[in-house]
Amino acid sequence: MYPAHLLVLLAVCVSLLGAASIPPLPLNVAQFDNMIECANYGSRPSWHYMEYGCYCGKEGSGTPVDELDRCCKAHDDCYTEAEKRRCHPKFSAYSWKCGSDGPTCDPETGCKRTVCDCDATAAKCFAKAPFNQANWNIDTETHCQ
């Protein structure tokens, strides 16, 4: 084999190894967003729930500040339980429908159903809970210890 071919082969292998270490984007984020908007009939965009209280958003800690924040904590806990069962909630695509009573999971089994149930329950909980503007984008360092 020619040295140039070896260099090309080495470059391909190195680039594949590098690509393998890049984490994939969450697949079900769009599904969960759509479920939230289905449950609340489009009255509040899903991004409003991203920086709410101590648990709605990236990571949660402390005591939930209200009912809506408790919904987010329950969703986090549901994902934690799914992970214990070797499911990957943020990367599990599932099937569901939006009906007059909100989101409903299709009859799937295993991880897809588990994650779908977590998201549907949370979306319905969000729709029922009041949104307190004072708890949006709070200082989590102060309020969530």
UniProtKB/Swiss-Prot annotation:
One of its GO terms (molecular function) is phospholipid binding. Disulfide bonds join 38-98, 54-144, 56-72, 71-125, 78-118, 87-111, 105-116. Its cofactor is Ca(2+). PROSITE patterns: PA2_ASP, PA2_HIS. GO terms for cellular component: extracellular region. It is found in: Secreted. Pfam families: Phospholip_A2_1 (PF00068). Expressed by the venom gland. Residues 22-27 form a propeptide. Residues 1-21 form the signal peptide. One of its GO terms (biological process) is phospholipid metabolic process. The keyword Metal-binding applies. Ca(2+) binds at residues 55, 57, 76. Keywords: Calcium, Disulfide bond, Hydrolase, Lipid degradation, Lipid metabolism, Metal-binding, Secreted, Signal. Belongs to the phospholipase A2 family. Group I subfamily. D49 sub-subfamily. This is Acidic phospholipase A2.
